[in-house]
Structures are given as structure tokens and as C-alpha cells.
Amino acid sequence: MKQYDVKISRVALSDMEQIYSYIADRLLEPDTAMGQYNRIAEAIQSLDILPERCALVECEPERTQGLRQMLVDNYSVFYIVGEDTVSVARVLYSASDLVRRLRRMK
């Protein structure tokens, strides 16, 4: 079975840090924040095997560009599968306007 190299963009890392900070500092739940951060990180790392298991997004032009979405609790991990690499672009709260936030990063 093919194994991919998983790369996380600076923006996606920042997204994860903001998720942690919000839960730890605003909601005053540091243990919950660490657990959520770890679940997202583990899910991202699992993309090294069978990254195509998650669906392409439904919106265009992101779908044509190969952007995929993986759900982790209440968060969406957006990534693109390349020849040997999985590139994680964003990690966003799923209840937000995902299309608008995805397009804002361009």
C-alpha cells in the first residue's frame, strides 16, 4: 500500500493553534483543547495511507482543483492529494461559512 508524505501549510497550523487557543482560553477548557488538537493532528497524519478515502468538496473551482474534505469532530480538514504528497491547506470549524473562508485564503 502506498504511503504519502503529509505536509501541513502554515495557514493550517495557524488554524489548529487558533482552535486550541479558543477552546483553552475562551472556553477555559485546556484539557479539552489539547484533546481536540491531538485528534485533529492524528487524523491529519492518518492521511499518509489512502488519502482518497475522503470526498472531494462540492463547490467549484475547488472540486476541480482536487480539494478534499475530512471531518474531525466539528472541524473540517481540507487537503489536496498529489503524486507522493498530501498537502493540508486549512482546518476550519465546520459550522462556519466554509466556502467563503476557503476562498479568502487565496
Ranges and model annotations:
Residues 1-63:
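Basic, Lys/Arg-enriched alpha-helical interface segments
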Residues 7, 39, 53, 68, ...:
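Basic side chains
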Residues 50, 54-85:
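Basic/aromatic recognition patch in beta-strand/loop cores that engages polyanionic ligands
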